[in-house]
């Protein structure tokens, strides 16, 4: 049977080792957070629209609806870029007509050996209407959709396809977003045919 003194003799080095490990971890965390690099780093794109914590439920709903809409367009990009149509998680952000139309249009493009590469920019998204009291809360959004850097290319050769020179590549789009049990979903996306 060990005495209290012999137990302390074994515990003290372990305690000191744990303290040294904790101190080293803290020092590493502090130095890694305070990098001296002047190069700004791009923030990662959110993989899912996370609910916003806010004291004002109206402002939180607006932020969540906009975040969902922006994530929706990132998934649309993925869907159009993947000829198999399997890499996108569009159902996390879209439903109803919006989901049906995007899936149908992407399939049509893929069936014709076309993919879209590049980026869609959702500019100045704003909530223009909000109804949180209905059975299914709903928001109406307006934004400037810029598809000028979203190129249609041959899926095999990656060569750009010629498109009409007078097509709108930056236009106003009106969208409806509903809050479902699993989160906000884009249910309708309607280009307004106006430049922005």
Regions found by a protein language model. Give the residues of each.
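Core segments of small alpha/beta cavity-forming domains
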Residues: 52-120
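Extracellular mucin-like PTS domains
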Residues: 42-54
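C-terminal motif of bacterial Sec signal peptides marking the signal peptidase cleavage site
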Residues: 29-32
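Bacterial signal peptide processing site
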Residues: 34-37
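Structured, amphipathic secondary-structure segments that form assembly/contact surfaces
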Residues: 92-196
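Charge-rich, low-complexity terminal tails
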Residues: 42-43, 62, 140-141
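Bacterial N-terminal signal peptides that target proteins for export
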Residues: 3-21
């Amino acid at each position: 049977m060990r005495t209290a003194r012999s137990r302390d003799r074994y515990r003290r080095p372990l305690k000191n080792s744990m303290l040294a490990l904790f101190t080293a971890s803290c020092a590493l965390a502090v130095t890694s957070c305070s990098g001296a690099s002047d190069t700004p780093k791009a923030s990662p794109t959110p993989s899912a629209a996370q609910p916003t914590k806010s004291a004002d439920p109206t402002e939180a709903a607006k932020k969540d609806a906009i975040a969902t809409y922006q994530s929706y367009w990132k998934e649309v990009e993925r869907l159009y870029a993947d000829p198999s149509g399997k890499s996108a998680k569009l159902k996390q952000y879209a439903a109803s007509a919006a989901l049906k139309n995007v899936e149908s249009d992407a399939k049509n493009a893929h069936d014709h050996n076309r993919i879209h590469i590049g980026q869609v920019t959702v500019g100045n998204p704003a909530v223009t209407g909000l109804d949180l009291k209905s059975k299914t809360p709903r928001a109406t959004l307006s934004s400037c959709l810029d598809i000028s850097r979203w190129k249609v290319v041959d899926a095999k050769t990656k060569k750009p396809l010629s498109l009409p020179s007078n097509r709108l590549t930056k236009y106003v789009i009106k969208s409806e977003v509903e809050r479902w049990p699993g989160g906000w979903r884009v249910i309708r996306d309607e280009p307004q045919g106006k430049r922005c």
